[in-house]
């Protein structure tokens, strides 16, 4: 149905950009997510499904795709491949233990791309353009791209101190999560779901004002390539993303649809130049993004987009007698082997009911078998 139609379009966009499909396991060692995604991210502190297997190993159902792809990249020594960078895309189910609400499910189908082995700002722009083109391919009109830069480690460390200084006087007015974040990871306070709209947040220092020269120049180059690719975007300094591994470019694509509620971010991503090394691989830069299929379907529904789904079949083969049924069995198989989408009768209905069934299946052609003709080999 419509989900398959969307998946096919997503795959087509990725293949056009020369990305290869990768499949990773549904569960991994828990340590992968605690190290890769970060101890302070919501996903790890509150949202993972963890279990201990029979060998007493701590395992986690994957809450996101990047860490598993990077683990596979390291284990399979893809960094040694001559054709760099390695450009991959994936889709599959992710699991998050959170309160189910519109646009947020505990089991979700997620799709994403990862590029490993290039620090070129052009790759940042390419990944953002893939996201935008996917949404355009399914017909979404109302989308907005928000971009930001978290800079390099030096810029972030500097900004971190500024944030701690700024937020400390307001500690009693913060939600419990933000109180914990203040020392551990103050950037995450800007991502707060509770106090996000408060004046304290709106007046907080902006990271774009604290980027060092190298980080600022890099961010300007990303914007230059987005302009060359004719992609509309807004620089939004409050975009920090919920995972701890990002640096430099981060972005979100939101749905500008009436009645979409608070879960209006369709997809998001960014650059993670330190993640491969953090997971015991070589120092290899990376960039990626992910999107939930459920939210995309919701946006398509809200925009009243009709996907062109072909639910017809090429031919329906009808019969009544046992002799006709035997012939139908071989005929249906032969047609299928020649590339046709074919069905036949399986419940012993009469011809009148079979006509109705063919109609329900939107069959383009009918073949009605007749004992007399079969005897005469007609």
For the regions a protein language model found, what residue spans apply to each?
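TRNA-recognition modules of translation machinery and tRNA-sensing kinases, especially anticodon-binding
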Residues: 2-378
């Amino acid at each position: 149905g419509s989900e398959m139609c969307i998946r096919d379009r997503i795959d087509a966009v990725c293949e056009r950009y020369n990305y290869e499909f990768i499949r990773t396991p549904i569960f991994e060692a828990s340590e992968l997510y605690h190290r890769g995604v970060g101890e302070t991210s919501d996903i790890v502190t509150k949202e993972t499904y963890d279990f201990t297997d029979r060998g007493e190993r701590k395992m986690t159902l994957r809450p996101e795709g990047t860490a598993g792809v990077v683990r596979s990249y390291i284990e399979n020594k893809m960094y040694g491949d001559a054709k760099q960078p390695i450009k991959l895309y994936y889709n599959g189910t992710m699991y998050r233990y959170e309160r189910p609400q519109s646009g947020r499910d505990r089991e979700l189908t997620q799709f994403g791309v990862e590029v490993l082995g290039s620090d070129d700002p052009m790759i940042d722009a390419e990944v953002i353009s893939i996201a935008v083109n996917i949404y355009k391919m399914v017909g979404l009109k109302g989308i907005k791209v928000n971009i930001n830069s978290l800079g390099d480690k030096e810029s972030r460390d500097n900004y971190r101190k500024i944030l701690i200084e700024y937020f400390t006087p307001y500690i009693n007015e913060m939600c419990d999560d933000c109180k914990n974040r203040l020392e551990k990871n103050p950037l995450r306070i800007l991502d707060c779901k509770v106090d996000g709209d408060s004046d304290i947040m709106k007046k907080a220092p902006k990271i774009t004002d604290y980027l060092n020269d190298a980080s600022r120049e890099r961010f300007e180059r990303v914007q230059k390539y987005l302009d060359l690719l004719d992609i509309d975007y807004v620089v939004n300094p409050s975009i920090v993303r919920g995972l701890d591994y990002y640096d430099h470019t981060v972005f979100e694509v939101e749905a500008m649809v009436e009645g979409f509620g608070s879960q209006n971010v369709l997809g998001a991503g960014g650059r993670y130049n330190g993640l491969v090394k953090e997971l015991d691989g070589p120092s290899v830069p990376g960039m990626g993004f992910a999107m939930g299929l459920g939210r995309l379907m919701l946006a398509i529904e809200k925009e009243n987009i009709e996907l062109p789904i072909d639910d017809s079949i090429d031919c329906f083969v009808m019969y009544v007698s046992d002799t006709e049924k035997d012939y139908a069995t071989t005929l249906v198989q032969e047609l299928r082997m020649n590339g046709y989408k074919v069905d036949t009768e399986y419940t012993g209905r009469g011809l009148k009911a079979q006509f109705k069934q063919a109609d329900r299946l939107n069959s383009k052609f009918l073949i009605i078998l007749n004992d007399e003709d079969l005897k005469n080999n007609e």
